[in-house]
């Protein structure tokens, strides 16, 4: 993750076709999709896809986790995994029932809300859809802004959050080939 473009959010688009940091995977041609192949960017750097993705922080719908538990996956209900989400976060909003602080992953709200995005959210609300100011809180449905894995204008990848603080440990060896 030595490229400055990995750490600067504006660099997001530079990685779609960069074989140095992206495995350049795509789906098989889909007959129902006009035989198109859909590009699936996957990170080929320390931090994996968290180093080249769009930095959107959404944990997933709590009912998905609860369904995994109902299918027999002990330890995977939303209540089971929520403490780990909270522990992983350094939430800009502060600590509460759904969010944690002090973790390795910086999570923040968008700092510049575009008028067109605001109009879209307002239109959804006017059409009867709920506005949601926290998709990682009590409810995951509705329209609103998602949070980012970014702090002070820099990406918070797993390499930055987890590996960088541990890189000098005597019991850690990082192999990249």
Go through the PLM ranges and name each one.
Residues 1-177:
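N-terminal redox-cofactor-binding region of secreted/periplasmic oxidoreductases
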């Amino acid at each position: 993750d030595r490229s400055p473009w990995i750490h600067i959010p504006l660099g997001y688009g530079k990685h779609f076709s960069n074989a140095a940091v992206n495995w350049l995977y795509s789906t098989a041609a889909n007959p129902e999709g006009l035989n198109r192949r859909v590009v699936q960017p996957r990170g080929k750097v320390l931090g994996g896809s968290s180093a080249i993705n769009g930095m959107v922080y959404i944990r997933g719908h709590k009912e998905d986790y609860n369904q995994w538990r109902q299918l027999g996956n002990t330890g995977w209900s939303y209540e089971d995994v929520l403490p780990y989400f909270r522990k992983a976060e350094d939430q800009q909003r502060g600590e509460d029932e759904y969010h944690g602080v002090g973790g390795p992953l910086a999570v923040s709200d968008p700092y510049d809300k575009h008028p067109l995005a605001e109009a879209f959210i307002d239109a959804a609300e006017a059409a009867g859809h709920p506005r949601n100011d926290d998709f990682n809180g009590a409810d995951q449905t509705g329209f609103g802004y998602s949070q980012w894995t970014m702090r002070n204008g820099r990406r918070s990848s797993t390499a930055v959050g987890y590996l960088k603080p541990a890189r000098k440990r005597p019991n850690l060896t990082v192999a990249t080939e």
